[in-house]
């Protein structure tokens, strides 16, 4: 990751671009992945790692780290606060990042861990994006959006992103 400050700066920069410096409405779709670390599918994660890493020793090492996590839900989850977990969730979520940018063609997308925003001047466009996002997360990554944490609002109404309210 590149840190909260970069994400916050990009948020402001994107909001300025989408709103054409406050000359038009900037809509923001804000979402949160439900039980993020606990829901990471270990098999899917290893398959993603195998697509990017050819060295079998490295793959085995990552597999051991992933499988060392004791969970009530077998084959699911990564330990919170572990440095390798932070790297691995970004490897995992990179699949989603690529989908949002290249398949959904969303230029103004920012993700920080399990929180993400997509900005657009067209509210209906963002409404149409929601089922696509849900389907991809569900089918490809076995993740779900937190049902109470999907918000569609204008930037001027004040958007809480990463603990900072932007308007």
What are these model-derived regions, one by one?
Residues 160-167:
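Active-site and adjacent loop segments of nucleotide-processing enzymes
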Residues 2, 6-113, 117-153, 158:
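Conserved polymerase palm-domain catalytic core
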């Amino acid at each position: 990751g590149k840190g909260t400050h970069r994400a916050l700066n990009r948020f402001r920069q994107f909001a300025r671009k989408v709103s054409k410096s406050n000359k038009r409405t900037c809509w923001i779709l804000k979402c949160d992945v439900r039980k993020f670390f606990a829901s990471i599918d270990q098999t899917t994660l290893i398959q993603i790692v195998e697509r990017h890493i050819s060295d079998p020793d490295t793959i085995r090492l990552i597999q051991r780290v992933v499988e060392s996590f004791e969970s009530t839900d077998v084959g699911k989850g990564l330990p919170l606060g572990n440095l390798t977990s932070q790297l691995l969730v970004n490897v995992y979520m990179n699949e989603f990042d690529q989908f949002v940018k290249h398949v959904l063609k969303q230029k103004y997308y920012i993700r920080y861990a399990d929180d993400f925003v997509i900005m657009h001047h067209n509210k209906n466009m963002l409404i149409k994006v929601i089922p696509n996002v849900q389907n991809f997360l569900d089918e490809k990554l076995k993740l779900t959006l937190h049902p109470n944490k999907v918000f569609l609002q204008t930037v001027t109404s004040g958007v809480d992103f990463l603990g900072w309210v932007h308007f």
